[in-house]
């Protein structure tokens, strides 16, 4: 499957191209800069996104189930409909993020996320 090829993904990130609907399940993408990218409906289940930059990204309806978001920056990210069940979020920053439900905010806070007040 072409969109699971890491070189393909990194080329799109580098060129700042849309990643809408992409399948990135279980990939190691720590420290990658996804800032301001379109990641709507992306499947990021089980991804390691520790220290990744997702500032201003559109993660509407993205699947982040069991994603590792430790120390990731999701400031000003659009997260309406995003699934964050089981996400590890210690030290992750969500300052100015939009679209999170009250229950998701409480869950993320309980996991050590910041910027959710």
Placement of each model-derived feature along the sequence:
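Tandem repeat scaffolds
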Residues: 1-117
């Amino acid at each position: 499957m072409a969109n699971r090829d890491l070189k393909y993904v990194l080329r799109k990130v580098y060129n700042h191209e849309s990643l809408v609907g992409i399948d990135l399940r279980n990939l190691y993408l720590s420290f990658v800069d996804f800032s301001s990218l379109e990641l709507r409906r992306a499947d990021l289940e089980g991804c390691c996104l520790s220290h990744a930059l997702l500032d201003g990204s559109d993660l509407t309806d993205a699947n982040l189930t069991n994603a590792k978001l430790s120390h990731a920056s999701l400031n000003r990210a659009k997260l309406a409909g995003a699934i964050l069940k089981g996400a590890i979020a210690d030290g992750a920053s969500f300052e100015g993020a939009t679209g999170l439900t009250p229950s998701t905010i409480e869950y993320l806070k309980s996991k050590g996320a910041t910027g959710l007040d």
